[in-house]
């Protein structure tokens, strides 16, 4: 029986740009079904270090929904919501940008407890410039 891998990534995806799209496509190549957590407003938990999104959550949802590589979008408000989502969704791999390698990520303990692989996708924008 072949293994079916559900993947997960998350972010605010404000002003969706080619780097976001490339990252999401790369994540989808590495799993069978990709769930994207959409952070509604990062300033709820971290007003001192994050900016309020320019686009509405509805606009960002529609843009993500237009990507063929996104299978499911789950909006969330807080980091606690993210942890709860990761504790309940059937996911086998979480995709994170390589810029987070070596850093503590939200839900890392849930990944350890549930045996969810954390896969770092290289983040480089130089190949996107022509």
Give the ranges of each region predicted by the language model:
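Short, structured coil segments at secondary-structure junctions
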Residues: 68-69, 89-90, 113-114
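N-terminal catalytic cores of NTP/NDP-binding nucleotidyl/phosphoryl-transfer enzymes
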Residues: 3-40
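Proline-aspartate-enriched helix->loop->beta-strand connector
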Residues: 85-86, 90-95
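Short hydrophobic/charged patches on amphipathic alpha-helices used for structural packing
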Residues: 61, 82-83, 87
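Short acidic amphipathic segments
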Residues: 61-79
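Short, surface-exposed acidic-centric catalytic microdomains
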Residues: 23, 32-67
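Conserved small/polar residues in nucleotide/adenosyl-binding loops
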Residues: 126-130
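Short secondary-structure boundary segments
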Residues: 38, 77, 97-99, 122-123
């Amino acid at each position: 029986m072949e293994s079916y891998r559900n993947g997960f990534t998350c972010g605010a995806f404000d002003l969706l740009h080619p780097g976001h799209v490339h990252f999401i496509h790369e994540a989808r190549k590495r799993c069978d079904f990709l769930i994207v957590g959409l952070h509604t407003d990062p300033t709820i938990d971290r007003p001192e270090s994050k900016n309020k999104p320019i686009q509405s959550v509805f606009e960002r949802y529609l843009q993500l929904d237009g990507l063929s590589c996104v299978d499911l979008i789950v909006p969330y408000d807080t980091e606690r919501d993210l942890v709860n989502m990761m504790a309940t969704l059937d996911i086998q791999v979480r995709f994170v940008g390589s810029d987070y390698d070596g850093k503590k990520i939200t839900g890392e303990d849930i990944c350890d407890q549930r045996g969810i692989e954390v896969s770092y996708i290289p983040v480089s924008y130089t190949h996107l410039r022509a």
